[in-house]
Amino acid sequence: MQRIQHSIPGGSWHDWPENLMLECHKKEKGQTYTSVYGRMCWEDVAPTITTQFTGYGTGRFGHPEQDRALTLREGAIIQTFPENYSFLPEGEAVVIKDISRQIGNAVPPRLGEIIGLSIKEHYTKRKYVRKSESIKKGG
């Protein structure tokens, strides 16, 4: 808990006092992982949500103010799932690992919507152009 409490918004394990440093981060190789044990910052862009976003030590998934990692619902909201979206059938037991995998592996719904609308718009314009060309040719 002390490590989490010493992580500042936008910061990571680099902000910890020496006595809280993990041995792996004292080694040269371990110093390259700058986002692990990271705390999000309200003013920054959210991190990429991975399948392990519910773990504080797996990336910049620390809540900006509270001493904890993101919840499943918070990760889903960052991914643009509707707030009332259900990831399992009613009555089924919640398995955090399974749901975090669904959320982390998902194409964000809003991104999918934008791409779909773009494809539809392109198709509609293309269809209109083909129809116009056909009319000009007398067909």
Regions found by a protein language model. Give the residues of each.
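C-terminal target-recognition/interaction regions appended to catalytic cores
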Residues: 1-139
